[in-house]
Amino acid sequence: SNGLILVTGPTGSGKSTTLASLIDRLNEKESGHIITLEDPIEFVHSHKKCFITQREIGSDSISFSRSLKALLRQDPDIVLVGELRDAETIEAALTIAETGHLVFGTLHTNSCVQTVNRIINAFPSDRHDQVRTLLSFVLQGIVAQQLIPKTFESGRVLGMEILLPTTAIRNLI
């Protein structure tokens, strides 16, 4: 499959763990080439059914956006972008998703609506319509998550909001 799947939440909300679980599941069930761009690499993935290339920003590559521009020459099926930090990185991720790849990414936002708005507002206002259109075509889902303290015992529990785009949601974007 292709498109863009985002896992969002504040620092320490388990975004990296969720993405590592998704990558591991795909690695067990699918075959293909997975490329991860991370800062830093938090989970090391071994090859199962997929060939996995993990790159660390700062040591293996200069930036997320620069890595994304060069990445298509390695013929990935799935791409994980550790963090969509700026318009250049977001645009590269959207373009890769548009060209038939499955792209996972994270943002530090607290809700699905805030995530959509953050992506659009990362660009100058004269590009908002173009970004909205592209996002509405490639978005496959957003998981906004937080770790919430348990009420009657120690520890935390995962709370999440999931947006799966329907035709109506795509039109609203």
Question: Where are the predicted features?
Answer:
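Short, flexible helix-loop junctions that flank or precede catalytic/ligand sites
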Residues: 1-173
